């Protein structure tokens, strides 16, 4: 049974690592430019603090997932890993929430505030952001699954 737990945990951590790393890479490489009324502007992820937060959070989650791959269930650090899994789940959930809110404003605009949608002018940027958000959402869901599995492992430590 312990071997099955280790295999499942390793598999889910690898999936999280792939999803979070993909979200980071796709978000960091998102860039497009447009010209409107003879004015040129660049759209990149650094223009929105929410996208920067999203990229940094996913980078942290992928780094932590990589390190956690090498820890054993039998080490005393496993309870710390459990607490860090909770923290990473919350961190990823907050980053996907804030990035989705900004992406929604970018796509639809906000008529009450007078903000126009920008995805019509910079579609490549919006496509990159959408891809990053899909990968980030996958990472958050996978971390939730990993957290539930970790809760089960902590509450039922039987081999």
Swiss-Prot record:
Main subcellular location of this protein, as a coarse class: membrane
Compartment(s) of residence: Cell membrane
TM ranges: 7-27, 51-73, 87-107, 131-151
Quaternary structure, from the entry: Homodimer and heterodimers.
Segments in the Extracellular topological domain: 28-50, 108-130
Protein name: CASP-like protein 1C1
GO cellular component: plasma membrane
Record lineage: Eukaryota, Viridiplantae, Streptophyta, Embryophyta, Tracheophyta
Top-rank lineage group of the source organism: Eukaryota
Record topology, Cytoplasmic segments: 1-6, 74-86, 152-159
NCBIfam families on file: A_tha_TIGR01569
Annotated membrane topology: Multi-pass membrane protein
Keywords, in A-Z order: Cell membrane, Glycoprotein, Membrane, Transmembrane, Transmembrane helix
InterPro entries registered for this protein in UniProt: CASP/CASPL, CASP_dom, CASPL
